[in-house]
Curated annotation (Swiss-Prot):
It comes from the Bacteria. InterPro entries: AAA+_ATPase, ABC_transporter-like_ATP-bd, ABC_transporter-like_CS, ACT-like_dom_sf, MetN_ABC, MetN_ABC_transporter-like, NIL_domain, P-loop_NTPase. Keywords: Amino-acid transport, ATP-binding, Cell membrane, Membrane, Nucleotide-binding, Translocase, Transport. It catalyses: L-methionine(out) + ATP + H2O = L-methionine(in) + ADP + phosphate + H(+); D-methionine(out) + ATP + H2O = D-methionine(in) + ADP + phosphate + H(+). This is Methionine import ATP-binding protein MetN. Part of the ABC transporter complex MetNIQ involved in methionine import. Responsible for energy coupling to the transport system. Residues 5-243 form the ABC transporter domain. One of its GO terms (cellular component) is plasma membrane.
């Protein structure tokens, strides 16, 4: 895919030189037509990154490139043209309370100079797309949180942007409404071809919607990859913590103590991979090694059409036989010994 948004050595600082940079030498490429999630804890630099994409902030050094244009080299009038191609939705919806749903969606079209008949036609199209035709003349206070966010999405799409920025757009919604909004964003991406950048601190959002993800910490990208890559084999402590909030495939310290108290055999955790080699080794465990096994913890998940996870096994047999089986297991996948 062609790059749609690029950060090239971007640093952004606020205040004096003693203040840590909000972004610190950041390099990142977001491809055209993908859903890209950026996840990180508070203060990681996520919101600053978004404001650089739509040129509401300017980098202290480095360059931000959108559609092949270096934003740092553009004049304000040219930046206005770039911003016109970028829609944005927010955590708190940011709707005009005094305007109807129709009026909120029509507002950016009016600012852009669309004639009244074209505005009416476009708003009708967007209301149908987000499933709110019957709410056209309602006011924001008459809407649920999910409906407000649908209005926000429709408004952000009004001028046919090529990029949609979603800054914590579901963090104030309940799980069911969040799922509905994420499904709508998937439609926006699939049917309209819009590149979507999602800023979030919720790994469930990443799992549900993203093609790729970057983990941001202290203004730097510390890990990036497809959602499957990051979920199935996180490389950094921060990524592992985030993944652990939605997946409990491996036992924690309390789980290990409980397993040790209930099981006398050796306990190992085996990473599940898509190639099926672990299953082949385990199927030979009794016949080849005279070792019995029991699954005592773990789980398997599916992402992007592939399976991954971890199984924690109790291995029961003579020590030499168990050693031989563990050696075979290590040849098939990653093995961590939990308890001898």
């Amino acid at each position: 895919m062609a790059a749609h948004i690029e950060f090239r050595g971007v640093t952004k600082s606020f205040g004096s030189g003693d203040t840590p940079a909000a972004l610190d030498g950041l390099d990142l490429t977001i491809d055209r037509g993908e859903i890209f999630c950026i996840i990180g804890y508070s203060g990681a630099g996520k919101s600053t990154l978004v404001r650089l994409i739509n040129a509401l902030e300017h980098p202290s050094s480095g360059s931000v490139v959108v559609d092949g244009r270096d934003l740092t080299a553009l004049r304000e009038r040219e930046l206005c043209g770039v911003r016109a191609g970028i829609g944005m939705i927010f955590q708190q919806f940011n709707l005009f309370r005094s305007r109807t749903v129709f009026g909120n969606i029509a507002y950016p079209l009016k600012i852009a100079g669309w004639p009244a008949d074209k505005r009416k036609q476009r708003v009708a199209e967007l209301l149908a797309f987000v499933g709110l035709t019957e709410k056209a003349w309602a006011y924001p206070e008459q809407l649920s949180g999910g409906q407000k966010q649908r209005v926000g999405i429709a408004r952000a799409l009004a001028t046919n942007p090529g990029i949609l920025l979603a800054d914590e757009a579901t963090s104030s919604l309940d799980p069911e409404t969040t799922a509905d909004v994420l499904a709508l964003l998937k439609r926006v991406n699939a049917e309209l071809g819009v590149t979507i950048v999602v800023i979030t601190h919720e790994m469930e959002v990443v799992r549900s919607i993203a093609d790729r993800v970057a983990v941001l910490e202290a203004g730097r990208v510390i890990e990036t990859g497809t959602v499957f890559e990051v979920f199935s084999n996180p490389q950094t402590t921060t990524a592992r913590r985030f993944v652990g909030t939605v997946l409990r495939n491996q036992p924690g310290a309390a789980d290990v103590e409980r397993l040790r108290g209930k099981h006398s055999g050796r306990i190992v955790s085996a990473r599940i991979q898509d190639d099926g080699r672990l299953g082949s080794v385990l199927s030979d465990a009794v016949g080849r090694h005279c070792v019995r096994f029991e699954i005592v913890y773990g789980g398997i998940s599916a992402l992007q059409g592939r399976s991954f996870g971890s199984l924690t096994l109790e291995l029961i047999g003579e020590p030499a036989d168990v050693d031989a089986l563990i050696a075979d297991l290590r040849g098939a996948t990653e093995i961590e010994e939990v308890a001898a």
